[in-house]
Each structure stands twice: as structure tokens, then as C-alpha cells.
UniProtKB/Swiss-Prot annotation:
One of its GO terms (molecular function) is structural molecule activity. It comes from Methanocaldococcus jannaschii (strain ATCC 43067 / DSM 2661 / JAL-1 / JCM 10045 / NBRC 100440) (Methanococcus jannaschii). Belongs to the archaeal FlaG family. The chain crosses the membrane at residues 9-29. This is Putative flagella-related protein G.
Amino acid sequence: MIYLASSAMSEIVMFVAVLLIAAFVAGILTTSTYKISLNINKKGDALATKLSQDFEIINDPGDIVRNSSAGTIALYIKNTGKDPIIFTNDSFTVIIDGSIVEINTTNQLTSPGSNILSPGDVGEIVVNYNETGYHRIKVISECGISRIIRGYIS
């Protein structure tokens, strides 16, 4: 009789141990799934922002105008996205032939004085660059969207 009672008791202890382990594993899986879903939401929001903000470089690739006395060139940016784009010297980066060049000024041409490019608006980025010839120009926005133009600087 004692043998039967100890056998039943050990089975109960094992059963409780298995239940505790199963609850622990379920808790870990629930927490992991929650963290994954939060990260997916963050990535989705970032991607939605990136997709709703877009721009194009609208310079004529055959003749990118250079101001030789000031040592600058002008790049024209059009907001082709659905959302406004902040348009300041710090909100864009310009790379010419692999080298980052300094932005001299940004000018909102559609609504002068504004620091926002609304959808359809055109802005001018004036960069310090005084070399002629064919060049590869890359403009990158603060949210990571980049556009490239290969053109002749006259």
C-alpha cells in the first residue's frame, strides 16, 4: 500500500512539474510573439512614411547649371509623394562622384520662405561644387529616400 501511495504522489509531482514547465514555455512564447509584433508595427510605420514621402531630381541631365563665380550648382527637387517633406539644409545630403558636398542653401520655389515642400512643390538645393563635366549626383532625404542623376555640369 505504501508503494502505491508513493507512486501516485510521484506522478502528481511530475504532473505539476510538467504543468509549470508548460506554463513557463507558453509565457516565453507569448512575450516573444508580442515583441515581434511590436517590431513589425514599427517597421511598417517606417516603411509607410518612406513610401508616402518621395521626390525626384528634375534638372536637365544634359545641362546642370553652374554658377562659376559663386562656385555652386543648383539641383531642383520636386515632391512627388503624398506627404510634405521638410526642406532645409539639414534634411538632405548631396553626394557628387562619391564625395559628400556642402549644401549652401535650400530655396522653396513654389512657396518662397517655406521650409516645407508640399506634394507637387519644387525646391532648389544649391551646393558648393565648381567642377564641369559629366558627374553622378545623388540626393538623399532624411528618411533615406535617394535619387540619382547622371548629368553634365556646364
